[in-house]
Amino acid sequence: MKIGVVYPQTELGGDPEAVRAIGLAVESLGYDHLLAYDHVLGATHDREPKLTGPYTELHPFHDLFVMFAYLAGITQRIEFTTGVLILPQRQTALVAKQAADLDLLSHERLRLGIGLGWNYVEYDALGEDFKTRGARADEQIGLLRRLWAEPVVTFDGKFDHIDRAGILPRPKRSIPIWVGGMSEAAFRRSGRFADGHILMGTVDGAQQAWARIEQYLAEAGRTSVGFGRELPIGGQKTPLEMAETIAQWRDAGGTHASIVTMGKELRTAQAHIDYIAEVRHHLDREVQGRAS
């Protein structure tokens, strides 16, 4: 199983030195990937309709493509995972271009997790329709893959229109697209279009969600073999409890796990690094125990 770390976007005040330190630590400690959450704008919640999501204008978020491009230049091995990029609030052709360049410049280290988001204020500010975001995402996934593969694309969809145009340079592969979310619509979207799914919550809840995704894969005539399953794992866990939960997810069939250090009252980048270092210690001991 691939094990990574979620970058603690909301807790380090947008500190560039924290980005560098944590990115380098994730690689040096032997983790497989760095996952990061996405928001373009934070918004005050006191409005109508009410906003009920977990973030406000007080929570910092680095731009994922910019942050990962920076980290690609100072690391050699770790994968970069958008977990998730709010795709429907963005222009499809621009995402195709940004993702292609990041994948090329990082030597094929991008995994593009996509989702719909919950903040209609972001959509309004970016000029996209919040109400049609699900249908738009379905259309965007196929168009992204065409833009990465074809020199010239003609596309006349409900949301995007391209007349004999393409991006260059194109990536050397079809960048993996994973869907994130715990709604029935997200499970269906994964079954029809995705290379993997980013789940949420507990191991038991993720297993139940996976059963639904398997049904949608079968309905689409697709196999679950090679289909990825990632669970970001948070909560008030000690490093040992975190390692034990990762092992539970592995034993349940998970292919990827990510350590969430946010919400643990870790006040500095070094405190976050110390936590993931201790988790790594317990993970290595568990592997040694299974091998003996």
Regions found by a protein language model. Give the residues of each.
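Active-site-adjacent structural elements that line small-molecule/cofactor binding pockets in enzymes
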Residues: 1-292
